[in-house]
């Protein structure tokens, strides 16, 4: 996890502009650097480093003697960099995984380069010989990237929007900042005056397509066909590979563990892989909740079963409420379900940073979208409609769950790794017949649970544990985080304020008091930036005004049972 920042064609004092880059210093607490581009006095790179790989030579922008005209600033992990280096016999100057981007680009251009990368990434690549600038982001947007560009060709790029909002430019008093779309790269011409002109924006990969880099990876050959046992075997192979490749780090690894299916599978597989790799330290797992919450109890059971060094983080309602302002500032969003679910992740990340030496943190993000794990999938009118919804959710991850996972951990200088969003695992899962992936017998993620039933990775009661609403998991059904928040905002937002909400917030007008409260905080930090959120996360196929699973009939029935 690092923070990248760059300016092209700035007409303001660069030393003043560079102060904006300090707003993302939390992403890279180990070192930082600003570097002007030779021959372009108004172009500059900024980098905040979290040293995860190659502590000695990992500073950026990356430049190597063989390509003196290439400048690279990137945030990410390229898991297949060694395989590609050996395959094409590239001569490396460092041990940094990102160096592969320079070699691939020189060999085959930007399209082939980005399609060959197995990992998560956001990058800015400058080619001064050919006068080009390239921006790129991974398929699901696991690593963030924002840009601002004016009509006269001033370009600013940053890992987080907060590093751009205060920049100055002569042609506009208000610089429009927007997220760079996942699964895309952009080509821009670099002009002699340091400004740029966009040439093309290209969507290079669809989540359902097998990635090009699959031709060169070391995953054992998959079995053909869609018979259940064949599919289960292939899923186990790909999931093991997804976890194993993410062990690439020089820092200690930990894992978030809620006791739910997804994080438990990741933790169990991770511990198994660490033992096989003969890693000398015990795996630290981390759970958060209020006292005796279902998540804490389930996570404790998993930790005892797999043998991890387990940490439990307790918080109370006051601490949760007090964290909301910091959380919304970190998230750069006012989406209700994202804010709600981020408080626990923010607080546990804070604990990890202050009390342990774990820096690279695994989690189960992405599984609900990929494997149709949300409770409302029980309402899908057909397997095909469920498939469409799953792909829509994956496409929008960068606005919601992936955003939450990145910002809450990066705020405390941690790096998050998400095996369920592995290219090969996810593309294979999405290639399966729609009817195999839907909930069965009233149980969501049935295929995923069935896949690991005979693996002995987890206790059966965890493997088949019903999905909890997040607010219930970290607290209790009787006094959930959802209810705590509703009671609090009832005293913060009155009916008169709600009656005039459309006048005050004409875009994405909040429909609930909780939504109104979050929007107020957001506007205080980021006035006039409401369009960063195109729409609220909301369950489909039901008439919902609140995203909580507690409002779903199926969940209410299960909770009473």
UniProtKB/Swiss-Prot annotation:
EC main group: ligase
Residues annotated with Phosphothreonine modification: 545
GO cellular component entries: cytosol
Keyword field: Acetylation, Amino-acid biosynthesis, Asparagine biosynthesis, ATP-binding, Glutamine amidotransferase, Ligase, Nucleotide-binding, Phosphoprotein
Residues that hold L-glutamine according to the record: 49-53, 75-77, 97
Site, Important for beta-aspartyl-AMP intermediate formation: residue positions: 365
InterPro entries cross-referenced by the UniProt entry: Asn_synth_AEB (IPR006426), Asn_synthase (IPR001962), Asn_Synthetase (IPR050795), AsnB_N (IPR033738), GATase_2_dom (IPR017932), Ntn_hydrolases_N (IPR029055), Rossmann-like_a/b/a_fold (IPR014729)
Listed name of the protein: Asparagine synthetase [glutamine-hydrolyzing]
Organism for this UniProt entry: Cricetulus griseus (Chinese hamster)
């Amino acid at each position: 996890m690092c923070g990248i920042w760059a300016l092209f064609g700035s007409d303001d004092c660069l030393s003043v502009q560079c102060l904006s880059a300090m707003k993302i210093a939390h992403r890279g607490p180990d070192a930082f650097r600003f570097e002007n581009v030779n021959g372009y006095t108004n172009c500059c790179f900024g980098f905040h480093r979290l040293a995860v790989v190659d502590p000695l030579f990992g500073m950026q922008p990356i430049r190597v003697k063989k390509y003196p005209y290439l400048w690279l600033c990137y945030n990410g992990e390229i898991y297949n960099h060694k395989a590609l280096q050996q395959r094409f016999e590239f001569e490396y100057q460092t041990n940094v995984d990102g160096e592969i981007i320079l070699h691939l680009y020189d060999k085959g251009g930007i399209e082939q380069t980005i399609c060959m990368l197995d990992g998560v990434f956001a990058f800015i690549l400058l080619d001064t010989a050919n006068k080009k600038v390239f921006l790129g982001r991974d398929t699901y947007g696991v690593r963030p990237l924002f840009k601002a560009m004016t009509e006269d060709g001033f370009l600013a790029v940053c890992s987080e929007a907060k590093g751009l909002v205060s920049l100055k430019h002569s042609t506009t008093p208000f610089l429009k900042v927007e997220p760079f779309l996942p699964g895309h790269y952009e080509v821009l011409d670099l002009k002699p005056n340091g400004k740029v002109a966009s040439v093309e924006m290209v969507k290079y990969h669809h989540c359902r397509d097998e990635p090009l880099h699959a031709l060169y990876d070391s995953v054992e050959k998959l079995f053909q066909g869609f018979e259940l046992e064949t599919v289960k075997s292939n899923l186990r192979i790909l999931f093991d590979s997804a976890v194993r490749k993410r062990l690439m780090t020089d820092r200690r690894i930990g894992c978030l563990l809620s006791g739910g299916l997804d994080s438990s599978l990741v933790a169990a597989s991770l511990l198994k892989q660490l033992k096989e790799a003969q890693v000398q330290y015990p795996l630290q797992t981390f759970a958060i909740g209020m006292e005796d919450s279902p998540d804490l109890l389930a996570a404790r059971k998993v930790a005892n079963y797999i043998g991890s060094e387990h940490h439990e983080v307790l918080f109370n309602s006051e601490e949760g409420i007090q964290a909301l302002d910091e959380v919304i500032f970190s998230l750069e969003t006012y989406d209700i379900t994202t804010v709600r679910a981020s408080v626990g992740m923010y607080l546990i990340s804070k604990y990890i940073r202050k009390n342990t030496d774990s820096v690279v943190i695994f989690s189960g993000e992405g599984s609900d979208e990929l494997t149709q794990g949300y409770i409302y999938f029980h309402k899908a009118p057909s397997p095909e409609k469920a498939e469409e919804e799953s792909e829509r959710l994956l496409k929008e991850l960068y606005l919601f769950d992936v955003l939450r996972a990145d910002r809450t951990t990066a705020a405390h200088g941690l790096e998050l790794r998400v095996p369920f969003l592995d290219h090969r695992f996810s593309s294979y899962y999405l290639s399966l017949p729609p009817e195999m992936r839907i909930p069965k017998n009233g149980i969501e993620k049935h295929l995923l649970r069935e896949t690991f039933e005979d693996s002995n990775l987890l206790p059966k009661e965890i493997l088949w544990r019903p999905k909890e609403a997040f607010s219930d998991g970290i607290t209790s059904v009787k006094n959930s985080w959802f209810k705590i928040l509703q009671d609090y905002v009832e005293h913060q937002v009155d009916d008169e304020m709600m009656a005039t909400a459309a006048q005050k917030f004409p875009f994405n007008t909040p429909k609930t008091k909780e939504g109104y409260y979050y929007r107020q905080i957001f506007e205080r930090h980021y006035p006039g930036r409401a369009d960063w959120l195109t729409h609220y996360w909301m369950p489909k196929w039901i008439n919902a005004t609140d995203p909580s699973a507690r409002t779903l009939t199926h969940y209410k029935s299960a909770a009473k049972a």
